[in-house]
Regions:
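Small-residue-rich
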Residues: 18, 31-56
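Short, surface-exposed loop and linker segments with low hydrophobicity and enrichment for Pro/Ser/Thr
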Residues: 16-19, 67-74, 299-302
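Non-heme Fe(II) oxygenase catalytic core, chiefly the N-lobe of the double-stranded beta-helix
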Residues: 24-28, 33-37, 49, 61-238, ...
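Catalytic core of Fe(II)/2-oxoglutarate
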Residues: 237-314
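N-terminal regions that are enriched for targeting/export leaders
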Residues: 54-55, 65, 310
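C-terminal His-loop and adjacent cap/lid subdomain of alpha/beta-hydrolase
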Residues: 10, 17, 135-136, 270, ...
């Protein structure tokens, strides 16, 4: 994948017009196979590898300077200014993340949703490897130790609504998952993403969910090597029409030189908002996302980041 700088262009976000630098970048979308396949452990390659991929050039817009215009329940993602008591080396230790960082994450979530009644942490991933841009190579192993996991290059959404409940059941037991369903509250899934140092290469891009149509999304049932089941979403560049001549209409954004104080919260499912899963033609309130390469940054320090996935009840 590659990218080149182009001119600054005016972008419309709701009723607000902003001037934003634009990159032309190539992203790995999903290309459905002619013959549907049953889920298997190899479906991890649909996120990290070369199978069923469609390389598409898109415009990527820098939010730096107007990041406050993006809201989680309007666009599917939001940036927050934060401070953490965690040192970078603390993220080498799972127990420190769980004991010190998870409470910080809860505080940040409550800044957006002060009415939150319960927060269930589904785990964390610390990334510290080079983005794989040669998709002819096998998918990287998923169970590498901390900081050995590379950024995810495939456009995706972490969980479907049902996938969130499946992961909750695996983490805490089916009884708790069933209790959460039975309470009937609004339930949301998030990825809380933060660099451990300033991002000089392989940044993370996110899509304004208002530019996504339900036909662009493909639910993927997954079976992991340990037998655990899940369900997430891979994304087609143009679900409504297939001709290659029609450009992808997704509105992509990233933050140039995102720092450890620039927290990114990405909504991945929402029982009260993302109703495309239940109703044909319903709203897509989640944000597809993917990492991408910046040319000329090959010698920059490897991107190090942490993401915490959680489910909240309102």
């Amino acid at each position: 994948m590659s990218s080149t700088q182009t001119e600054t262009k005016t972008q419309i976000h709701g009723s607000i017009a902003v001037e934003a630098p634009e990159l032309r970048v190539k992203l790995a979308y999903y290309l459905p196979p002619e013959v549907p396949r049953a889920p298997s452990i190899y479906d991890l390659e649909l996120i990290n590898g070369s199978r069923d991929q469609d390389i598409v050039e898109v415009a990527m817009h820098d939010v730096r300077g107007h990041e406050s215009e993006f809201k989680i329940d309007t666009h599917g993602f939001q940036y927050l200014k934060v401070n953490s008591a965690m040192a970078k080396e603390d993220f080498d230790y799972d127990e420190r993340i769980e004991e010190k960082y998870f409470p910080e994450v809860e505080e940040w979530i409550r800044r957006l949703y002060p009415q939150t009644t319960k927060i269930h942490h589904l785990g964390h991933i610390v990334r510290g490897a080079v983005l794989q841009t040669d998709f002819s190579k096998p998918a990287p192993a998923w169970n590498k130790p901390n900081r050995g996991i590379a950024p995810a290059p495939r456009v995706h959404i972490d969980f479907t609504r049902e996938g969130g409940f499946l992961v909750l059941a695996q983490a805490f037991g089916k009884e708790l998952s069933d209790e959460v369903r039975a309470r009937g509250r609004r339930v949301l899934c998030f990825s809380i993403w933060r660099p451990l140092s300033t991002v000089r290469r392989d940044p993370l891009g996110v899509v304004d969910c208002n530019s996504v149509h339900e036909a662009d999304l493909f639910k993927l049932a997954r079976i992991f090597p340990d037998g655990a089941r899940g369900e997430n979403v891979v994304v087609k560049a143009n679900g409504r029409t297939l001709p290659e001549s029609r450009p992808c209409g997704h509105k992509w954004h990233y933050m140039n030189e995102q720092t450890s104080q620039d927290l990114l919260i990405i909504k991945t499912s929402d029982t009260g908002d993302c109703d495309w899963e239940m109703t044909p033609g319903g709203r897509v309130g989640s944000s597809p996302h993917a990492s991408f390469a910046l040319p000329g940054t090959e010698n920059e320090p490897i991107r190090e980041s942490v993401e915490v996935r959680c489910i909240i009840e309102l």
